[in-house]
A protein has these predicted regions:
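A glycine-rich, often tryptophan-bearing local segment used as a flexible ligand/cofactor-contacting loop or short
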Residues: 114-237
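Bacterial N-terminal signal peptides
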Residues: 31-39
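Cysteine-centered motifs
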Residues: 15-17
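Extracellular ligand-binding/catalytic regions of CAZymes and related secreted enzymes
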Residues: 45-46, 88, 159, 262-268, ...
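Short beta-strand segments enriched in small/hydrophobic residues
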Residues: 46-58
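Positively charged n-region of N-terminal signal peptides that target proteins for export
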Residues: 19, 26-29
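Catalytic beta-strand/loop cores that center a nucleophilic Ser/Cys/Thr
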Residues: 78, 82-85, 102-103, 179-289
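Helical hinge/lid and interdomain linker segments adjacent to catalytic or ligand-binding clefts
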Residues: 56, 60-153
């Protein structure tokens, strides 16, 4: 029996008291858990995104207030979990001040005809933060020749080469030299040796000399005719592809054609094709030190590519995913 009566008093059985205490404890624990979940969600910090744009006059053919501002405004409208700053090459410190870079978790970079104006000091400020895992870098379209992107690809090429020869020449001393492409910002011909490439020769029984040919960061064909492309999701489970259909038509864009002279990416998210048979790996991710770089190909400043909702979804997804790393 749960109750015993003695001299007109009712005594509660100890087991019943324990059950009641356990029930009260569990309800309190559940309430506290819900409180902390709701509180954490309420105070979650937004991902801080710095949109960098070289700003050149031909952007006016498709964008009223610069391409970078268009991206920033549309990303801001996509959700309250993204905080935006839009900066430009002509801003103080080229928009790459310590204040901006220390604030940002992700940089989205648009550059085309003014790539060479970015100073070596600013390239280092960006790439050092990427390598340290303090900043992620998104290169758009013609930013395959952005100086921070090329610096990141050069770093990755050398890292891949060292890992390769450490594996294939265990215990041997290997010294390295690097060779840049024949001329900066030139287009490689079809049939060229794909870069990056690395070779080593034997100096003696214990040491080797290796040569690393750095990546061209370009491709043999391009066609700025505004013809449509089909963007196909190759990694449907990837966070960058969340909420997207399997295939997306880009009504107006410039064509790039493989092979793209870059290190082998860690992930390929999208592939783009054209009616004449060209193809391109149009969404790629590399691990660069402790950080990440994402290259997204569609574009050309004369076409309203970044007014297309799917393109903004991709940039928003990428920013959230990279910012959480």
């Amino acid at each position: 029996m749960a109750l015993r009566q003695h001299a007109g008093l009712i005594e509660t059985h100890p087991c019943l008291c324990l059950r009641r205490l356990h029930s009260i404890f569990m309800k309190t624990l559940l309430s506290l858990s819900l409180f902390f979940v709701v509180t954490s969600a309420a105070v979650a910090k937004p991902t801080r995104v710095l949109v960098w744009d070289e700003r050149q006059p031909r952007q006016a053919e498709a964008y009223d207030n610069w391409l970078g501002n268009e991206i920033a405004q549309r990303l801001k409208a996509s959700g309250s979990d993204l905080e935006l700053r839009s900066v430009a090459l002509d801003d103080p410190e080229q928009g790459l001040s310590d204040d901006n870079l220390n604030w940002a978790e992700v940089v989205i970079w648009w550059g085309h005809v003014r790539q060479g104006e970015v100073t070596e000091a600013n390239v280092k400020r960006v790439t050092d933060r990427v390598l340290a895992g303090e900043l992620a870098f998104i290169a758009l379209h013609s930013a395959h020749w952005a100086r921070p992107f090329m610096a990141a690809m050069n770093w990755r090429a050398q890292d891949d080469a060292r890992k390769h020869f450490t594996r294939t020449l265990p215990g041997k001393l290997v010294t390295y030299t690097t060779v840049a492409p024949p001329k900066p910002q030139t287009v490689p011909a079809h049939g060229s040796v794909l870069t990056p490439a690395y070779f080593a020769y034997k100096k003696n029984n214990t040491s080797f000399e290796a040569t690393i040919h750095l990546p061209w960061c370009c491709f043999p064909d391009y066609r700025p005719d505004g013809k449509p492309s089909t963007l196909t999701v190759k990694a449907p489970g990837h966070p960058i592809a969340a909420g997207l259909p399997t295939k997306i038509i880009v009504p107006q864009t410039e064509m790039y054609n493989e092979p793209f002279h870059v290190p082998t990416p860690d992930e390929v998210i999208f592939e783009e094709t054209w009616e004449l048979g060209e193809r391109f790996r149009s969404g790629m991710v590399w691990n660069i030190g402790k950080g990440k770089v994402f290259y997204f190909r569609p574009g050309h400043e004369q076409y309203p590519v970044f007014k297309q909702p799917e393109m903004i979804t991709i940039l928003a997804n990428a920013s959230r995913w990279l910012g959480a790393k």
